[in-house]
């Protein structure tokens, strides 16, 4: 089940990505159609049908027959999108905005600012800022730097990918703390051993992944795990300008665990409790 179901008052079943069609957009300004692979089972609706029915019941009528009608409405509201028609995208077509004309002569814009930037002098503008030291400080008690990172395999909080046996075979709970071989030797930690990672905010158990990949003094952890949840460690130190949390710099301590057998059982028990709680929530 999805962890967000625990917070929901109403759950409306919708089609998955392979059960409907529409248009994808990406950070490269591209639009591309995608197509339904299989017919949905049971009493499901697409997201746009659900949103339309909710809006209509709340006094804002929304009536569409298909996704093309929705897309046509959207592109006519934005001049840069107007030329990106369903027909022009075709089966495997790919249109990058600006695409302002519906004629075939306008095939979109592969990259912006080909001749000059949209500034008074036609040049790009770069801004610098002064370096500011991290708010969290290393001490004898917390001598290592934790950075939260991403890795291939699982997505976000694993509410979906965590149910895939193939991905679980690649990596599973309680996740990993990547540390340098020199740090591992100094701390008496072996590869794949369970360890405690502590910060000023909290403490979690996870599995050591020892290699030369991390820098000495650094600890890298992904945020997908429920047991080895690195977000339990990071503090909410915010940048005064962007308000971005200082998740890439957190002072921590890594400790070996003498009784590995008991630690393994602890992880199994805690994981079972979490899954049981999610299962009960999903069942209502």
Model features per residue range: what roles?
Residues 7:
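Short gly/Ser/Thr-rich phosphate-binding loop of adenylate-forming enzymes
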